[in-house]
Amino acid sequence: MGGASIWHWIVVGVIVMLLFGRGKVSELMGDVAKGIKAFKKGMADEDQPQAPVANQSPPPVSATEPVRTLPPHQGEPAPAANASVDRKVG
């Protein structure tokens, strides 16, 4: 009970043939076969090693302006112009 026997599959096949017709079913199966072939071809292409890229040097870098380095920071930072400084004179 509940098992799918060969007769169940035959009935399902007949119903599909009646609903879609012979032309649609064969067209659908042809599309499935093309998809499987494309998948297999893609897998075969992936397995083959790809041709190595020719030894190319990187493109030359155009020097428009020389790079400047900043001297290391020394001392305390200068107070901001609008900051008030409270000092006791004493």
Curated annotation (Swiss-Prot):
GO terms under cellular component: TAT protein transport complex
Membrane spanning residue stretches: 1-21
Annotated keywords: Cell inner membrane, Cell membrane, Membrane, Protein transport, Translocation, Transmembrane, Transmembrane helix, Transport
Compartment annotation: Cell inner membrane
Gene3D superfamilies per UniProt: 1.20.5.3310
Example GO molecular function: protein transmembrane transporter activity
Keyword Disulfide bond (UniProt): no
Pfam families according to UniProt: TatA_B_E
One Gene Ontology term from the biological process aspect of the record: protein transport by the Tat complex
Topology with respect to the bilayer: Single-pass membrane protein
UniProt KW Iron keyword: no
Region (Disordered): 42-90
Function description: Part of the twin-arginine translocation (Tat) system that transports large folded proteins containing a characteristic twin-arginine motif in their signal peptide across membranes. TatA could form the protein-conducting channel of the Tat system.
Subunit structure: The Tat system comprises two distinct complexes: a TatABC complex, containing multiple copies of TatA, TatB and TatC subunits, and a separate TatA complex, containing only TatA subunits. Substrates initially bind to the TatABC complex, which probably triggers association of the separate TatA complex to form the active translocon.
Protein family according to the UniProt entry: Belongs to the TatA/E family.
Name of the molecule in the record: Sec-independent protein translocase protein TatA
Organism: Methylobacterium nodulans (strain LMG 21967 / CNCM I-2342 / ORS 2060)
Lineage: Bacteria, Pseudomonadati, Pseudomonadota, Alphaproteobacteria, Hyphomicrobiales
